[in-house]
Amino acid sequence: MLFRSPELVELVSSVVGIGKRATTEIIIHTNGFENIDNYRQLISFLGLAPIENTSGTSIKGRTKICKQGGGKVRSIMYMCAMNAMKNNPACKELYDRLVAKGKHKIVALIAVCNKLLKQVFAVVQSKVAFDKNYTKNVA
């Protein structure tokens, strides 16, 4: 699948912060995004979805990430998030905003991982390479 669609490799690797290894792992784990319908499925499938430990009003536990996906992809995405904070303005802004709000740095880093995966999914769905200077026109 990976070598049959070089345009998919180009699209995924166009996202700032996603390298060759991460591109390969994401495409292999998702089988070329064949059964992924939205970015929430992608995040959950790769094991980076936040889950809350609650029971009604009596128990309020810490929010964790579900580790149902491959640990290898999770660790690679973690490293990509650290790289993206230096080079991807949207990721840097998200990280700084969450840390300034009082969130733990690891929580902010997982949010950056999810932001990267959202960007990857958007690029794959639209079939347009990532543009880090893109701004959404709001009317």
Residue ranges with predicted function:
Residues M1-A139:
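A detector of single, family-specific signature residues
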